[in-house]
């Protein structure tokens, strides 16, 4: 059986890689994928905690996080499509103005 620290280390690494991706990348889609990686790291830790401490509450929270992430994915991807149609780029440097009149 794999130890609790091994799962905690993997979940910490997933979260850290996702956080670095959010901070360092300029592509909106890559930032979105990094956010999803961070959520998966959190979910892995919650499931590990539930398994080793025989508690069902973290599993319920994980199911809620997964369902919220699915709704977030639908909204975020539609926003990405609209931004790409308007600016023809997914680079965050292009999106400096919030007004519609400016290109």
Curated annotation (Swiss-Prot):
Gene Ontology terms describing biological process: ATP synthesis coupled electron transport
Keyword Cell division listed: no
Keyword Translocase annotated: yes
Annotated InterPro entries: NADH_UbQ_OxRdtase_chain4L/K (IPR001133), NUOK/Mnh_C1-like (IPR039428)
Key words of the record: Cell inner membrane, Cell membrane, Membrane, NAD, Quinone, Translocase, Transmembrane, Transmembrane helix, Transport, Ubiquinone
Superkingdom of this protein's organism: Bacteria
Gene Ontology CC entries for this record: NADH dehydrogenase complex; plasma membrane
Signal peptide per UniProt: none
EC number(s) stated in the UniProt entry for this protein: 7.1.1.-
Catalysed reaction equations from the record: a quinone + NADH + 5 H(+)(in) = a quinol + NAD(+) + 4 H(+)(out)
Topology of the protein relative to the lipid bilayer: Multi-pass membrane protein
GO molecular function per UniProt: NADH:ubiquinone reductase (non-electrogenic) activity; quinone binding
Compartmental location: Cell inner membrane
Described purpose of this protein according to its UniProt entry: NDH-1 shuttles electrons from NADH, via FMN and iron-sulfur (Fe-S) centers, to quinones in the respiratory chain. The immediate electron acceptor for the enzyme in this species is believed to be ubiquinone. Couples the redox reaction to proton translocation (for every two electrons transferred, four hydrogen ions are translocated across the cytoplasmic membrane), and thus conserves the redox energy in a proton gradient.
PANTHER family documented for this protein: NADH-UBIQUINONE OXIDOREDUCTASE CHAIN 4L (PTHR11434:SF16), NADH-UBIQUINONE OXIDOREDUCTASE SUBUNIT ND4L (PTHR11434)
Family as reported in the entry's similarity comment: Belongs to the complex I subunit 4L family.
Protein name: NADH-quinone oxidoreductase subunit K
Species, as recorded: Aliarcobacter butzleri (strain RM4018)
The organism's taxonomic lineage, starting at the top: Bacteria, Pseudomonadati, Campylobacterota, Epsilonproteobacteria, Campylobacterales
């Amino acid at each position: 059986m794999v130890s609790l620290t091994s799962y905690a280390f993997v979940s910490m690494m997933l979260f850290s890689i996702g956080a670095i991706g959010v901070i360092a990348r300029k592509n909106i889609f890559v930032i979105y994928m990094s956010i999803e990686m961070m959520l998966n790291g959190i979910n892995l830790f919650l499931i590990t905690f539930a398994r080793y401490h025989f508690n069902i509450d973290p599993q319920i929270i994980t199911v809620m996080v997964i369902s919220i992430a699915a709704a977030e994915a639908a909204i975020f991807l539609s926003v990405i499509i609209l931004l790409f149609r308007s600016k023809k780029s997914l680079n965050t440097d292009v999106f400096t103005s919030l007004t519609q009149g400016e290109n």
